[in-house]
Amino acid sequence: MNIVEQMKERIKEEIKRAVVSAGFAAEEEVPEVILEVPREKAHGDYSTNMAMQLARIAKKPPRAIAEEIVQHMDKTKASIEKIDIAGPGFINFYMDNRYLTELIPTIIQAGASYGETNVGKGQKVQVEFVSANPTGDLHLGHARGAAVGDSLCNILEKAGFDVTREYYINDAGNQIYNLAKSVEARYFQALGIDKEMPEDGYYGEDIIEIGKKLAEEHGDKYVHMDEQERLAFFREYGLNYELEKIKKDLADFRVTFDVWYSETSLYTSGKIDETLALLRERGHIYEKDGATWFRSTTFGDDKDRVLIKKDGTYTYLLPDIAYHQDKLRRGFTKIINIWGADHHGYIPRMKAAIEALGYDPDVLEVEIIQLVNLYQNGERVKMSKRTGKAVTMRELMEEVGLDATRYFFAMRSSDTHLDFDMDLAVSQSNENPVYYVQYAHARVSSILRQGEELQLSYEGDLQLDYIQTEKEIELLKKLGEFPSAVSEAAIKRMPHRITGYVFELASALHSFYNAEKVLDPENIEKSRARLALMKAVQITLQNALALIGVSAPEKM
């Protein structure tokens, strides 16, 4: 807990003590003390609505309650300079902000670990994201899911959760049969043999490339092979080719996974049969019209769901239930799925299945990723200029850069549509948020280099009482918010809280830089203190940007 968190706790304790001392409630009956940062600076550093919370119990006007609470408070116990009462009874606290300078050596000493919290308490959390079918390129929806998922994992780890990152490989089912048939057709065509593409085939350039590669390396070796053997080979070849491509694209996007979980393994291990037997044993399965049904309405779904069709084939739901059963057996306290917008209706049946298996349905959390619209020159970009098809993740990365892509995708709440302005993403101006933030880091790094050239060091004993101007205090306050921003982003599953935070920190830095002279050869101790402040800003910017997968350049 850093000095800011400690101070907030002291204020809360002092409010609680004052409430008890004033006779409004016994210690165990005092409502939770809520401290908020007022929107207007004029309303102080912190504010509480405790008087309103107590009004019903005390049967007094909130303002009168607030006055009594203030009378019983000891300001010296929490570095409070002034307290006032506003509106119907809000209590506003104005801090003696000199205590904030203690943050500077704390941050420098913590380095890359600054911002770490323990709200997760080591809980085992699994985050499954991207999980695109291995039948073609990753597109914009996958890219946004990758950026949000990876950022969320980084944030959860920073907040003390034990995180497993998982990609579910959809390597069973009809789409993989169609992949094998598509590879077969392209292979025959590469040899000059007429072969029709399957009705639901994959027409991407990558499948044409696979066909050519096979023809070049193996000639007509597979033409005369038994068809089932040939398709089994093409299935594996095509699947591995596409998976390696996906892994490479994701690695280049700074996204890695701990587990690549194969859907096929659910069949070969008997886990699907085992899950079906368990649901049957619990009385949640019935037969109707030649099909096998899951009685999901028992658990709040709007209708029962087919698990096995009349022809004996499985619906998507059955292996998905088996997969979630396996997740739960691995001991995760939370399983977080990051799904595309088209999966919204799938959530109730999945939660129903989890409850039917005997688990708490709230163990499953689903974050929905809404659609992305690309804009260039003020117009919506629907197709790639190069391929005439949907824009891929790699194309976007190459067009606007990795950092801009990662930042923009994590900039808004994932459940809202995102309009991605490609012109803005590449512009070197303060209107471009990623440029603005990275420039703050480059600016701080430049100041630190200048300090080295002047042989000024921020190490050793510092006279931190030089740090006292309004802009310096604003910067310190923002630095002190980082751990709570991490905790909030983790608990609320909000990566965009960090993009918002890092932008605010950059803004505070630019504002300070424009108002103050950092290095003054005439005042060595003041310069050293300010250099230490700049080092603390540099560390915090680096740590925040790392959470959202964005680099922190030293020069721009």
Swiss-Prot record:
The keyword Cytoplasm applies. Its EC number is 6.1.1.19. InterPro entries: aa-tRNA-synth_I_CS, Arg-tRNA-ligase, Arg-tRNA-synth_N, Arg-tRNA-synth_N_sf, ArgRS_core, DALR_anticod-bd, Rossmann-like_a/b/a_fold, tRNAsynth_Ia_anticodon-bd. Coiled coil: none annotated. GO terms for cellular component: cytoplasm. It is found in: Cytoplasm. A motif ('HIGH' region) lies at residues 132-142. Its main location: cytoplasm. Gene3D superfamilies: Arginyl tRNA synthetase N-terminal domain (3.30.1360.70), HUPs (3.40.50.620), Isoleucyl-tRNA Synthetase, Domain 1 (1.10.730.10). The keyword ATP-binding applies. GO terms for molecular function: arginine-tRNA ligase activity; ATP binding. It is an enzyme of class 6 (ligase). GO terms for biological process: arginyl-tRNA aminoacylation. Pfam families: Arg_tRNA_synt_N, DALR_1, tRNA-synt_1d. It comes from the Bacteria. Keywords: Aminoacyl-tRNA synthetase, ATP-binding, Cytoplasm, Ligase, Nucleotide-binding, Protein biosynthesis. It catalyses: tRNA(Arg) + L-arginine + ATP = L-arginyl-tRNA(Arg) + AMP + diphosphate. SUPFAM superfamilies: Anticodon-binding domain of a subclass of class I aminoacyl-tRNA synthetases, Arginyl-tRNA synthetase (ArgRS), N-terminal 'additional' domain, Nucleotidylyl transferase. Monomer. PANTHER family: ARGININE--TRNA LIGASE, CYTOPLASMIC (PTHR11956:SF5), ARGINYL-TRNA SYNTHETASE (PTHR11956). NCBIfam families: argS (TIGR00456). Belongs to the class-I aminoacyl-tRNA synthetase family. This is Arginine--tRNA ligase. It comes from Geobacillus sp. (strain WCH70).
